[in-house]
Swiss-Prot record:
The lineage of its organism: Eukaryota, Fungi, Fungi incertae sedis, Microsporidia, Unikaryonidae. Belongs to the UPF0329 family. Residues 382-394 have a biased composition (Acidic residues). This is UPF0329 protein ECU03_0090. Transmembrane segments: none annotated. It comes from Encephalitozoon cuniculi (strain GB-M1).
Length: 614
C-alpha cells in the first residue's frame, strides 16, 4: 500500500475534483501516517497548490534506469550481458515486475474519495488477460553474441504488448463509471451530486478514449520517445550526471517512505504525452527532446512553449560551442603539424650542414666545429628553458605573477584541491538568529526582510552548513557534487554545484539536495554566494523554491558584501562545541551538537557520494 501512496502523491498525475480542501486533508493524513511529521497550515497550502497544478487524467512514462542502493545497475542502453555478474539476480527481480509496472503506468488513476474500484479493475484486467503475458526476464536474457536487446528496447516491447489490454480496460472503466453515476446516493445535496456526477463523467470519457487507436498510438509513441531521449541523455557526461543525481535522490525519497520494498522499481513520471510528441514532430530532433526531458525531469517542470524554447536554445548553444571547440582543435592540430614540419626541415638542414662540415675538415674535429656544436647545444638548452619558463608563466598567471620554478613547484603542491572564497551572505548564517535578522532587515534582499526570529531559526538550520566548504575544498569534491551549466546574470558568470544529502533532526529524516551557488569575481576567482540544504518535499510542493538544477536564481546585489570575502582557510568551529565532521568512503557527515551539552545531538547533515554507474 505504501507504493500506491507514493504513486498517488509523489509521481503520478491525479484526478481531483473541486473538493480540493477534502483531498488535501485526506492526502495529508496519509502522508503523516507514512512519515513522522505533521503538516502545518503553510504545508497544507503548498500541498493544495501542488494538487491543483497536477490535477488531470493521463498515463505516465517510465524512466528506464534500474538502481540498487547507491548504484545504477542498468542504464537505458544496458544489455543483459553487460550487467555486473553480482547484480544480475537483482536486475532480474526488477525486470520480472516490468509488465505489471508498465501496465500500472498506463491504467492507474487516482479517484478522489475511493480509488479501490479502479485499482481492483486494473488488477482484474491484468490477471485475466486472454493473451500470454510477456516473460520480460527471458526476453532480456535472450541474446546472440552482442545482439542482446537494450533495457529501453525491452521497455518498449513490453509496453506495446500491454497496450493490447487497454480496449478491455477502457470499456470496463467507462461501464463502471456509468454504473456509479446511476448509483449516486440520494442523500447527497444537489451540489455534491453534481460534483460526483461530473467526476464520474470525466472518468467515463477517459475510459472511452483509451479504446481508440489514436490514444493507444499516442501512449506508445510517447514512451518510445522517452526511451530514445533517455538513451541520448546517457551519452553526454554532463547530462547523465544531473539526470542520475535527480533519479538517485527520488529513489532515496521513495526508499524512506517505502522502506519495506525488496526491490526498487524504476520511476514512473507524468509527462504530457501530446506536448512531448508535438515537440519531436516539430523539430525532428531527439537531441532537443532529450534536453527537454532532462529539464522537465531535473527541474520538476512541465512541457510548455517556454520549456520547449529553452530546450531548443540549449541545444543550439551547445552545438555552437562544440563547433567552436572543433574549429579550435583543428586549428591547434594544423599549427602542431606545421611546427613538426618546420622542425623536420630544420633537422634535415642541420644534418646537411654537418655533412658539408665533415667533408671540408676531412673528418677532423677542428675548433670551429666544436664551437658550432657547443653553440647548437646551448641554443637547444635555451629553447627547452624558454619552454619551461613559458609553462611556469602560464601556470602562475592564474595566481598572480610568475615565480621561480622551484617556488612554483611548492606552490602547486600546496594548492592541491579547490580554492573558493565565501561571500558575506553565506557567512551571515553562522551568526545568532538575532544578528542575522538585524542584517537581513537592513539588507537589499527584499524576500528576507521582516522575517520573525522563529523563521530565521528554521532557515538557519538549512543555511548554516559552512562545514560543507571542507568537502568542497577537498580533492574528493567531484565524487560528491555535480556542476550545472553556467549562465550570466548581472554581468557575472554563475553556476551551481549540487549534491544529494540527508538532513536529520528529532528522529525525522529528509532527503534533498545540498546546493552551492557560485560566481566568477573580477579577479577570476570562484566565490560561494549561496549554500543550503533543500529538502525534496520543498521542491515538490512548490513552496516558492526553485529546482536545484534550474537555470538562474533570484539572488541580487552580489556586489554588497563582495569586499568582505573569506577564503575560509583554516575555518572550523571549536571541536565538540558546535559540530563534528565524520568522513567516510561514500559519505561526508556533519553532526551538530548543543553547545551547552555536547553529548546532545541537535541535527546532522550527510552529503552522499554520487550514485555509481556500473
Amino acid at each position: 500500500m505504501r507504493m500506491w501512496l507514493v504513486s498517488a502523491i509523489a509521481l503520478v498525475d491525479i484526478l481531483c475534483t473541486s473538493k480540493i480542501e477534502e483531498l488535501v486533508e485526506n492526502m495529508g493524513k496519509k502522508i503523516e501516517e507514512a512519515l513522522p511529521h505533521e503538516f502545518d497550515s503553510a504545508e497544507k497550502e503548498a500541498l493544495k497548490k501542488h494538487l491543483k497544478e497536477t490535477a488531470g487524467l493521463g498515463t505516465r512514462l517510465m524512466v528506464p534506469c534500474i538502481f540498487h542502493e547507491d548504484r545504477v545497475v542498468a542504464s537505458p542502453t544496458t544489455r543483459y550481458q553487460d550487467i555486473d555478474e553480482e547484480e544480475k539476480g537483482y536486475v532480474e527481480k526488477v525486470i520480472a515486475l516490468l509488465p505489471r509496472l508498465l501496465w500500472r503506468s498506463v491504467a492507474y488513476i487516482y479517484v478522489f474519495g475511493n480509488d479501490s474500484w479502479v485499482v481492483n479493475l486494473m488488477e482484474e484486467v491484468f490477471e485475466t488477460a486472454p493473451f500470454k503475458k510477456s516473460d520480460a526476464v527471458a526476453l532480456y536474457k535472450r541474446a546472440r553474441g552482442r545482439l542482446g536487446i537494450r533495457l529501453i528496447d525491452l521497455v518498449n516491447r513490453t509496453f506495446r504488448h500491454n497496450i493490447g489490454m487497454l480496449n478491455r480496460f477502457g470499456q470496463r472503466l467507462a461501464q463502471e463509471a456509468e454504473a456509479k453515476i446511476q448509483e449516486i446516493s440520494s442523500s447527497l445535496s444537489d451540489e455534491e451530486k453534481r460534483k460526483e456526477e461530473k467526476m464520474l463523467q470525466i472518468i467515463k470519457e477517459y475510459g472511452e478514449s483509451l479504446c481508440t487507436k489514436e490514444k493507444q498510438e499516442e501512449i506508445i509513441r510517447a514512451q518510445e520517445i522517452m526511451c530514445d531521449a533517455c538513451a541520448c541523455i546517457w551519452e553526454r557526461d554532463s547530462n547523465r550526471e544531473s539526470f542520475v543525481m535527480e533519479t538517485y535522490s527520488r529513489h532515496l525519497y521513495l526508499r524512506m517512505i517505502g522502506s519495506s520494498m525488496d526491490v526498487e522499481e524504476p520511476l514512473l513520471s507524468y509527462i504530457d504525452h501530446r506536448g512531448l510528441i508535438d515537440a519531436y514532430e516539430k523539430y525532428k530532433s531527439i537531441d532537443i527532446v532529450a534536453e527537454l526531458i532532462k529539464q522537465v525531469f531535473t527541474e520538476r517542470g512541465c512541457i510548455s512553449d517556454e520549456s520547449v524554447n529553452d530546450a531548443v536554445c540549449g541545444v543550439r548553444e551547445r552545438e555552437e560551442a562544440e563547433k567552436m571547440r572543433g574549429e579550435e582543435e583543428r586549428r591547434k592540430k594544423e599549427e602542431e603539424s606545421l611546427r613538426n614540419t618546420l622542425e623536420l626541415l630544420r633537422m634535415e638542414e642541420k644534418e646537411k650542414s654537418k655533412s658539408r662540415g665533415k667533408k671540408k675538415k676531412g673528418g677532423k674535429k677542428g675548433s670551429g666545429e666544436v664551437t658550432a656544436k657547443m653553440e647548437e647545444e646551448k641554443k637547444d638548452s635555451e629553447e627547452v628553458e624558454e619552454s619551461a619558463e613559458a609553462e611556469v608563466s602560464l601556470e602562475e598567471m592564474a595566481v598572480g605573477g610568475a615565480r621561480s620554478k622551484e617556488r612554483s613547484s611548492k606552490k602547486k603542491s600546496r594548492s592541491k584541491g579547490h580554492r573558493y572564497k565565501v561571500h558575506k551572505r553565506v557567512l551571515r548564517w553562522t551568526k545568532s538568529a538575532e544578528r542575522i535578522k538585524a542584517e537581513l532587515d537592513e539588507g537589499s534582499e527584499e524576500k528576507w526582510r521582516n522575517k520573525s526570529i522563529e523563521e530565521i531559526e528554521e532557515q538557519k538550520k538549512v543555511h548554516d552548513i559552512i562545514e560543507v566548504c571542507v568537502l568542497l575544498r577537498s580533492l574528493d569534491a567531484n565524487r560528491f557534487f555535480v556542476s550545472t551549466n553556467r549562465y550570466m546574470k548581472d554581468g557575472t558568470e554563475r553556476w551551481k554545484m549540487v549534491g544529494v544529502g540527508i538532513f536529520e533532526e528529532g528522529g525525522e529524516k529528509k532527503v534533498g539536495k545540498v546546493e552551492v551557488g557560485l560566481y566568477r569575481d573580477k579577479g577570476e576567482g570562484s566565490v560561494i554566494y549561496h549554500l543550503m540544504f533543500k529538502a525534496m518535499d520543498t521542491e515538490k510542493a512548490g513552496k516558492g523554491a526553485r529546482s536545484s538544477f534550474g537555470k538562474g536564481d533570484d539572488v541580487e546585489g552580489l556586489e554588497e558584501g563582495a569586499g568582505e570575502l573569506s577564503d575560509m582557510s583554516g575555518f572550523e568551529y571549536p571541536k565538540g562545541v558546535r559540530s563534528e565532521i565524520v568522513k567516510g568512503g561514500d559519505a561526508f557527515k556533519i553532526v551538530y551538537r548543543n553547545p551547552k551539552d555536547t553529548s546532545e545531538v541537535l541535527r546532522s547533515l550527510t552529503v552522499l557520494q554520487k550514485a555509481e554507474v556500473l
